[in-house]
Amino acid sequence: MEIGTPLFEGAKKLLWLGGGELGKEMVIEAQRMGIETVVVDRYDMAPAMHVAHRKYVVNMLDGNAIKSIIKKENPDAIITEIEAINTDALLELESEGYKVIPNAKAVKICMNRIELRKLAAEKVKVPTTQYGFAENPEEVKKICKDIGYPCIIKPEMSSSGHGHEVVYNESEVEQKFKEAITHARGKSEQVIVEEYVKIDRELTVLTYRYLDDKGVVTKTITPIEHQRPSDVYYYVESWHPSTVDKDIIERAQEYATRVVNELGGFGIFGVEIIVSGNRVLFSEVSPRPHDTGLVTMASLDINEFQIHVRSALGLPTPEVKIVSPAAAHVILANNEGWAPKFLNVEKALQIPGVQIRLFGKPSTYYKRRMGVVLATGNTVEEAKEKARKAASLVLVT
């Protein structure tokens, strides 16, 4: 492969749809490899725009606007970084010869919980929670009666906990159904109703596909473990490697491989697995680097962002090694504001083995993720303790 020089004829070019903190790290990795970078998002000064060669601000659900930019830029590959995009436009662009990472169909399926559950549970037959699909409250009631209360209602267009509602009895169904549909990450007409299980452990199995001289290769990385409070949809901390039993790791990696191979394409996928008692259950998958995988910037010799960029360019990543036990803990805003400032960074960095990534988001709102602390240690527990302490010191004003 030949890689040219950015901004000159012959340059390799990647275009991101979405410019958040995950996109920023991908753009940085691409810049290190001499790639020309373009970022598109719904608001100006998104984190990845700070480090890209060019930027565009458009409605990400406007298919015509997306297609116009891509045809103007003519990138070597299109990388999706967010869920709220026009997936039909991606399918159309792909049919015209544009390369979508991982592929347009995978992006569309991963955004739709119903289609993803059909693929995972019914097509490749990996274990999941008991479930049913519903278009109205009456259908929800029937499914909950069959499965048993409590149940969880999730809108078909959702991810990372958005619009998830726990239903404890029949009297709550009408209101919870309405709330689930209202808080979807796009237009949703159906919901998936799942059994409520006690989650003992939550894992992310980073699974990636790349092309070498022998064909397509699929590999998994030792699982990341993560935690999110029960009352919020976002993750708070992750650590790597997970300390779950070997049997659980093997099952989790097997299920992740089966799902990702069915989705196809190239790049890294964040496959979420839940452990409940002796059950190891597939939950969902992101067709891109995963937020819990921010920890790989400290734990791996080749982080998830570089792996994704390599795969997008048709480059191999034959081996990934853990270089240290590590943990990541988010830095959250506590109020609404503009042009935030960060206090006590110097105190946090006095802790050995700690790094801080501030994302550069131009505005804040309650519990918005504004940065992350990365920490290494002799053990995962030591790294977690360092990350928690450092994150508690940093204040967002």
UniProtKB/Swiss-Prot annotation:
Q: In which pathway does it act?
A: Purine metabolism; IMP biosynthesis via de novo pathway; N(2)-formyl-N(1)-(5-phospho-D-ribosyl)glycinamide from N(1)-(5-phospho-D-ribosyl)glycinamide (formate route): step 1/1
Q: Tell me which PROSITE patterns the record gives.
A: ATP_GRASP (PS50975)
Alphabetically list the UniProt keywords. ATP-binding, Ligase, Magnesium, Metal-binding, Nucleotide-binding, Purine biosynthesis
Q: Which GO terms describe its molecular function?
A: ATP binding; magnesium ion binding; phosphoribosylglycinamide formyltransferase 2 activity; phosphoribosylglycinamide formyltransferase activity
Superkingdom as given in the UniProt entry:
Archaea
What Pfam families is this protein classified in? Answer: ATP-grasp (PF02222), PurT_C (PF21244), RS_preATP-grasp-like (PF22660)
Assembly notes: Homodimer.
Name of the protein in question: Formate-dependent phosphoribosylglycinamide formyltransferase
Organism equals Sulfurisphaera tokodaii (strain DSM 16993 / JCM 10545 / NBRC 100140 / 7)
